A protein has these predicted regions:
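Polytopic transmembrane helical bundles with strong interfacial aromatic enrichment
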Residues: 1-447
Length: 447
């Protein structure tokens, strides 16, 4: 396979995963939000909240279905384009694939039961809400299984490698490795954070379309109730993200040092390593364009001390060093996070000190777009994770080139994957818009 074929295959896979992660984050978060809305409605004896839960459950069902289709496309792509990964590690990662299947069955069965028993006289409201919790359970277990596979690719464990063969396989260790746990507990709050902001933003846009004098009236009481609850939930998830990000940084410094070195363009192993913000990294590791160096900050983040050693890229063979473009992606990610922090501060500042400012059009618009900025942050995070593993498909054992199919037709049939995702994305948008359009004014966000 020539370089053009390898590059095309990576582009196709990146495109597929970029679309897939959007379906995933909604498929994981909406079950939690729907259950939360329903339980609040039951506790407060508020039919409007229950109706909102029912409204979002319809959208949730669409996104779960499209997520399944998306996942199937990914599985086909893995088998057809990257057969080397399964050939090399199938014996190790077979368990999480099987686990994911059973978890999905739990999710699918209880989702069908959940949707079929809305307003059923044979199922109490509390029992119906309990059924919804099993949907949450199934989706969460499914997410862990798939995340553990990615974690294994980033830091393989659970086997011995003797004479080019995998032996002494411990599938449990591979599935519940430190890498899997770190990735899972960092990515899940990120999904909850982003989707809760998207939903809050839709209600914010709804309020914003009204006249200024009407925005804080009883007409939008339920909308403000949802917005405030979701913004508090998002803030809680953001605090959790700060904690897990710190853990992730320290984990990278110890277990994937070349990735951290590429992110911060650390050429030589050093203590008192600075954190570099901004700039563009050249191939030889120089930083051009305006940038800021925060003295010793990277060492502190990596090991809680300025004297903590940060391993540099020169410790690794040139061909095994990750692309330095991850530094640019990380800077963009930090910039978007700073914008999101500003939006959260503005919202809670207005909420605490001057509630009338909540009706401000600029603030409502900022809340409205915040979820999409958060989605961009997640996309960038996964890009850093995956590109930062290059040139490896399974770090240290199997290169991306070795994992690629030997067929020369990748540039011919490969275009089917982005085309399929484009069609799926359009169909999903149309289906969700139809649900919103058909919903009554009192049952959710209006178009």
């Amino acid at each position: 396979m020539n370089f053009e074929g390898l590059h095309a295959a990576r582009v196709f896979m990146g495109d597929s995963l970029g679309f897939h992660i959007i379906f995933v984050m909604f498929g994981l978060t909406l079950p939690i939000l729907v259950s939360w809305f329903e339980w609040m409605g039951i506790r407060k004896n508020d039919q409007k909240l229950i109706d909102i839960a029912k409204f979002w459950s319809k959208i949730m069902t669409v996104l779960v279905i499209t997520g399944v289709i998306s996942g199937t496309i990914i599985a086909l792509q893995m088998s057809l384009v990257w057969p080397g990964i399964l050939k090399f590690g199938g014996e190790v990662i077979g368990l999480p694939f099987m686990f994911e299947t059973y978890a999905f069955l739990i999710e699918a069965v209880f989702l069908a039961l959940y949707m079929a028993t809305w307003n059923s006289k044979k199922v109490s409201k509390k029992m119906h809400a309990v059924i919804g919790l099993f949907v949450v359970l199934g989706s969460t277990l499914s997410a862990y299984a798939i995340t553990s596979i990615n974690g294994w690719m980033n830091s393989p464990s659970g086997f011995s490698y003797v004479n080019g063969n995998i032996v002494n396989v411990d599938v449990v260790q591979a599935m519940f490795s430190d890498t899997a746990l770190v990735e899972f507990f960092h990515s899940m709050p990120a999904y909850y954070f982003a989707v809760s902001l998207v939903v809050a933003g839709l209600y914010a846009f709804k309020v914003m379309r009204a006249k200024h004098k009407d925005r804080l009236t009883k007409r939008f009481k339920i909308d403000w109730f949802i917005i405030k609850r979701l913004m508090f939930f998002a803030a809680a998830m953001f605090v959790l993200l700060i904690i897990t990000a710190d853990i992730t940084g320290k984990y990278l410094a110890k277990h994937e040092p070349e990735k951290l070195a590429a992110i911060e363009v650390v050429r030589e192993t050093q203590t008192n390593a600075p954190l570099i913000l901004g700039g563009v990294a050249t191939e030889d590791g120089r930083i051009i364009a305006p940038h800021i160096k925060v003295p010793s900050a990277l060492s502190i983040l990596a090991g809680n001390s300025p004297s903590a050693e940060v391993i540099g890229l020169n410790e690794f063979e040139k061909e095994n060093q990750p692309p330095l473009v991850v530094h640019t992606f990380f800077d963009i990610k930090l910039t978007l996070i700073a914008v999101l922090v500003a939006i959260l501060i503005a919202f809670f500042g207005a909420y605490a000190f001057k509630p009338k400012l909540l009706a401000n059009k600029v603030l409502l618009f900022s809340v409205g777009i915040s979820g999409y900025l958060a989605i961009a942050v997640i996309e960038l995070g996964w890009m850093i994770t995956e590109i930062g593993r290059q040139p490896w498909a399974v770090r240290g054992y199997l290169t991306t080139a070795e994992a690629l199919t030997k067929t020369n037709d990748i540039t011919t049939f490969g275009y089917l994957f982005p085309f399929s995702y484009l069609v799926l994305f359009i169909v999903t948008i149309l289906a969700v818009r139809r649900i919103i359009k058909d919903e009554s004014k009192n049952n959710g966000v209006k178009k």
